[in-house]
């Protein structure tokens, strides 16, 4: 039987899709944006989708309706923790920003009410920057309060075969009674800093190499258009 996941701050369901591709089953998702919710419902027709502010959702009812949830996944909105926020002086950063704080609090409220075996928390690399130390401490304290041990790391998507150097903070929590979580070893590495037994990073050129550039339409196009 597939492990059943619920997602919050689901967007169009990218995290849900990744988990489904690795044997999990998405049974619940929620987002505030109706366009995103419509996309999730089309891509995961068997999932329950609620389009609402996460603060309004009773996750105990979701748990009871679904007959239990194995995992909670999601990435709270990243603007308060992004590098670009350092240049916007009029806005607060990290959990000093009310949206940054409440998004984390509501994530862990969902975790408490769903009481799954594990959780997956994703955010931008800036989440672990020194000025945002209190945000990571909040994640650590809430995890401990709810009976989870956590394992976190900044991962680069390029190290796992994706054609972009996207770095993200990944935090996985498991019940304290369960075995420790181990991050997978990189499968790829920067050819200039080669790691043994890994392939070179995949480039956009690699991805686009099989495209036929000799198209009839090219004759009608101007250079630079």
Regions found by a protein language model. Give the residues of each.
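Short beta-strand element of Class I
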Residues: 26-27
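S-adenosyl-L-methionine
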Residues: 38-63
């Amino acid at each position: 039987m597939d492990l059943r996941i619920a997602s919050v701050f689901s967007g169009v369901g990218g995290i849900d899709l990744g988990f489904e591709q690795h044997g999990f089953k998405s049974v619940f998702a929620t987002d505030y944006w109706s366009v995103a919710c419509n996309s999730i419902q089309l891509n995961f027709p068997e999932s329950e989708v609620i389009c609402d502010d996460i603060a309004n959702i009773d996750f105990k009812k979701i748990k009871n309706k679904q007959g239990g949830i194995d995992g909670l996944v999601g990435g709270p909105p990243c603007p308060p923790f992004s590098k670009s926020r350092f240049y916007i002086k009029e806005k607060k950063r990290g959990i000093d920003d009310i949206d940054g704080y409440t998004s984390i609090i509501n994530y862990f409220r969902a975790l408490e009410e769903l009481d799954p075996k594990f959780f997956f928390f994703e955010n931008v690399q800036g989440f672990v920057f020194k000025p945002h130390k209190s945000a990571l401490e909040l994640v650590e304290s809430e995890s401990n309060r709810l009976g989870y041990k956590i394992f976190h790391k900044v991962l680069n998507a390029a190290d796992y075969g994706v054609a972009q150097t996207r770095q993200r903070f990944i935090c996985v929590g498991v019940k304290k009674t369960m075995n420790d979580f181990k991050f997978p070893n990189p499968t790829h590495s920067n050819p200039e800093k080669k790691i043994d037994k890994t392939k070179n990073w995949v480039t956009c050129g690699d991805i686009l190499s099989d495209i036929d550039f000799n198209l009839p339409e090219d004759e009608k196009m101007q250079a630079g258009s």
